[in-house]
């Protein structure tokens, strides 16, 4: 039962509020809404010269006037629709080649004013959060609303046990790696050296399951050659790691107990530097992507371009590429004369074996890449971006790791991602560019860099 006070029993402030709600209708700020979806911006994406209809929702009979405010002026909006709770106002604009910034302003009959942009409804306008129309900026339609399934390959399914990382195969961060025999064993706290044996054949074997689950896109954590199970310390951007793909040459020995010298890890050296293994792994990956596409699913791979790994062939801190039966250039750790010297920032000139390179967040296993100091490095990574979205691999997009950290300045970071976008989109216009970023991604989403970001903020700190 609802109890209602009589006006005689109301306190003074309650009487005042009752009067205001009846004589001076309160502006219902929470009823205001607009966004960049088709319901409120039609079309959501446009080209120069297109007419775009912009819509604002308000409380029913709550607003006297509504305005669309753009860089070019203020336009009175027309009420075009209503339902039981809301009114809908609309205005149209014709876009040019320039980005169009806009927000909404509403007024009540009694002069109350409120603004609405991406931050929501407010009494004071902060134009930093205005909506933007970016002519020509289009995200691939297949990515919108797609169900994406992330696969950390080592922990998904083991389809080719003969490729498993072996006990003592090599040394990583001070200890030997090991093969986990019990798939259900809980990982150790420092479990980067533990390999459960998941591989791409395991993914292939489960494609029926993924398809029946309703997956639209498979997003793979890094797949390139790497000594860790997470593979965010890439050793070779040109090849899929044979441990998760195809090993056709498998010669050499594992490390003896107590031996931490990876030049003696000849089994590992053969597995990851022998071009027969590397080329077979790339061919296998191309076949897997083709099979995934046949089932109507897409593939996104992880691009770790801010830093590489200390095992990387450009640095070769472990001296494994200099021990390979195939010919590789000397690494920048080994020799000052290395063709990759400029790929890294060194703080001393003490060669050979110069360990003074800059590591991302101080981690010597994650050498930061020195783009500003090396045009050759920049061109190499731009070619990598193009390579994997092109024939024969035909990957459908990149997920960019710590994308805002790349480079040593914000100015260069934006410059690089503009070049990366052009390189990728020229090769495959339907490839998506999805960045990892915490915080406000506004500056990267102006149509010339990333397509979108992973929504870490909302999930981790809602």
Which positions does each model-derived feature cover?
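Short, flexible loop/turn elements at secondary-structure junctions
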Residues: 58-60, 81, 93-95, 152-157, ...
């Amino acid at each position: 039962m609802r109890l209602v006070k009589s006006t005689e029993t109301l306190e003074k402030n309650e009487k005042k509020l009752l009067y205001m709600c009846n004589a001076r209708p309160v502006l219902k700020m929470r009823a205001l809404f607009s966004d960049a979806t088709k319901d409120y911006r039609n079309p959501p994406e446009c080209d120069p010269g297109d007419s775009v209809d912009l819509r604002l929702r308000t409380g029913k009979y709550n607003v006297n006037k509504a305005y669309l405010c753009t860089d070019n002026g203020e336009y009175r909006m027309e009420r075009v629709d209503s339902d039981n709770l809301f009114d809908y106002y609309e205005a149209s604009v014709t876009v040019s080649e320039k980005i169009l910034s806009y927000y909404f302003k509403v007024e009540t009959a009694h002069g109350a004013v409120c603004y609405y942009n991406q931050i929501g409804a407010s009494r004071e306008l902060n134009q930093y959060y205005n909506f933007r129309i970016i002519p020509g900026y289009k995200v691939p339609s297949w990515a919108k609303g797609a169900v994406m399934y992330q696969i950390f390959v080592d922990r998904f399914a083991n389809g080719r046990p003969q490729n498993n990382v072996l006990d003592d195969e090599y040394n990583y961060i001070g200890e030997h790696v090991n093969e986990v025999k019990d798939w259900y064993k809980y990982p150790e706290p420092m479990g980067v050296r533990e390999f459960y044996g998941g591989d791409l054949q395991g993914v292939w074997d489960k494609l029926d399951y993924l398809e029946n689950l309703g997956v639209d896109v498979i997003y793979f954590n890094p797949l390139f050659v790497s000594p860790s199970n997470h593979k965010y310390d890439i050793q070779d951007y040109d090849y899929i790691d044979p441990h998760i793909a195809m090993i056709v040459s498998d010669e050499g020995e594992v490390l003896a107990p107590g031996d931490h010298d990876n030049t003696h890890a000849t089994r590992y050296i053969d597995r990851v530097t022998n071009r027969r293994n590397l080329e077979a792994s790339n061919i296998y990956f191309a076949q897997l992507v083709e099979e995934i596409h046949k089932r109507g699913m897409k593939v996104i791979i992880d691009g770790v371009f801010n830093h590489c790994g200390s095992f990387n062939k450009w640095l070769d801190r472990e001296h494994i590429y200099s021990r390979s039966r195939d010919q590789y250039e000397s690494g920048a750790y080994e020799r000052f004369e290395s063709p990759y010297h400029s790929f890294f920032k060194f703080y001393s000139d003490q060669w050979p074996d110069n360990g003074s390179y800059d590591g991302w967040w101080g981690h010597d296993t994650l050498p930061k890449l020195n783009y500003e100091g090396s045009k050759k490095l920049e061109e190499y990574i731009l070619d990598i971006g193009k390579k994997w979205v092109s024939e024969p691999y035909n990957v459908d997009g990149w997920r960019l790791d710590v994308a805002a950290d790349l480079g040593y300045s914000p100015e260069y970071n934006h410059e690089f991602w503009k070049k990366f976008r052009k390189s990728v989109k020229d090769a495959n216009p339907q490839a998506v560019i999805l960045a990892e970023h915490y915080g406000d991604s506004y500056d990267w989403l102006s149509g010339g860099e990333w397509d979108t970001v992973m929504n870490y903020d909302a999930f981790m700190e809602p």
